[in-house]
Amino acid sequence: MAWNTNLRWRLPLTCLLLQVIMVILFGVFVRYDFEADAHWWSERTHKNLSDMENEFYYRYPSFQDVHVMVFVGFGFLMTFLQRYGFSAVGFNFLLAAFGIQWALLMQGWFHFLQDRYIVVGVENLINADFCVASVCVAFGAVLGKVSPIQLLIMTFFQVTLFAVNEFILLNLLKVKDAGGSMTIHTFGAYFGLTVTRILYRRNLEQSKERQNSVYQSDLFAMIGTLFLWMYWPSFNSAISYHGDSQHRAAINTYCSLAACVLTSVAISSALHKKGKLDMVHIQNATLAGGVAVGTAAEMMLMPYGALIIGFVCGIISTLGFVYLTPFLESRLHIQDTCGINNLHGIPGIIGGIVGAVTAASASLEVYGKEGLVHSFDFQGFNGDWTARTQGKFQIYGLLVTLAMALMGGIIVGLILRLPFWGQPSDENCFEDAVYWEMPEGNSTVYIPEDPTFKPSGPSVPSVPMVSPLPMASSVPLVP
């Protein structure tokens, strides 16, 4: 079967069409929040407020940190593949730029609709970044195996499903999920894993050599890890209530991440017969504590509780990279490029369970009467709302998230299997040159039907060329 990866018309038309639609929808539906509107001046005077009381000054530092995580952290974390750095950063940039626009609309229709208009302020921007973070998680599962058009389509559907799932959890079930262990990480991970299972490639071994990293690519990926690790306390506390909740969320995340690093290093060394460290574990498993503490981050988890979560997740995540990822690929045909099940999936489920237990154990002694009302809205839509009820609904939220991710992933995966999206052939996966103009001599794209094809220059010593494989002739690349 021939694969046409020439996107000269398909990609420009797709990008332009989507952006024109965004412009029209924003023109019809989107307006500034009153704190971003010019009428803020009269509002400020009427209520005797200062400019510093504008929500922008409270939320913008957190927004900056979350924004860096989405575009720099996730982007560079996926540059570990030796020949897929352009695509990892570039396609992450593309899907995030489209995703934040669509997320502002979808989340606005569910949460911020006033007099038929979506009002946009700095908190909307943070929530849109959260939504896109879930898409970046799913991108890790299909990394190297899909075209940019497929990624845009996946982003469109995933953002839509994310907004629906978020509305069900936060508005209908009254779930607390400040750091998004369920809504962001669990949903994104199992949506992405389901999509990659539907897109299973039987002959992916033909691109096996490109799935390895080299010294430089691992260093770039470590940059992404460090940005994510440093800014994760802002991520988990960005939309918490001002004051003690936000303060507590940052402290809990800080502690969990620190503990996770030590246990990840310990297990990585213990699993190697000579006690050496695996860079894959250090890049990924060290972040699992930030994922797992997300749901309970703003609760009275206590610093030692956060340390325990990080301790446990560092062990589980590292073991997952060593044993679970190969098992999923060999037995269940789930080709998880970045190991998102170990960094986001399992830690996300752990986070959901920890959040349920922590909520169910909330008491007057720990929170105080006003603290319970403030933290869990116990005087909200149901007068009989108790801590145990909150715990049960936290579990319901986790189950709903898993169901939405699996069902949505199946549907979107079937759509992405259609043959005209410009996806790469099996022997040309994990290769930048399929979609990017490369420096001379850096292309290893294999075109077996062209007997005159020769590399454009000498190979780069640090990036070994991939030799043609016997099975490649059955799946040619049509330029």
Swiss-Prot record:
Tissue specificity comment: Expressed in brain, testis, placenta, pancreas, esophagus and prostate. Expressed in squamous epithelial tissues (at protein level). Expressed in kidney.
Description of post-translational modifications: N-glycosylated.
Membrane topology listed for this record: Multi-pass membrane protein
Effect on the protein of changing F74L: Reduction of ammonia transport
Listed GO biological process terms: amine transport; ammonium homeostasis; ammonium transmembrane transport; epithelial cell differentiation; homeostatic process; intracellular monoatomic ion homeostasis; regulation of pH; transepithelial ammonium transport
Keywords: Ammonia transport, Cell membrane, Glycoprotein, Membrane, Transmembrane, Transmembrane helix, Transport
Stretches in topological domain Extracellular: 31-60, 107-123, 170-177, 240-250, 303, 367-394
The keyword Ribosomal protein appears for this protein: no
Glycosylated residues in this chain: N48
InterPro entries from the UniProt entry: Ammonium/urea_transptr, NH4_transpt_AmtB-like_dom, RhesusRHD
Record-given protein name: Ammonium transporter Rh type C
Organism: Homo sapiens (Human)
Lineage: Eukaryota, Metazoa, Chordata, Craniata, Vertebrata
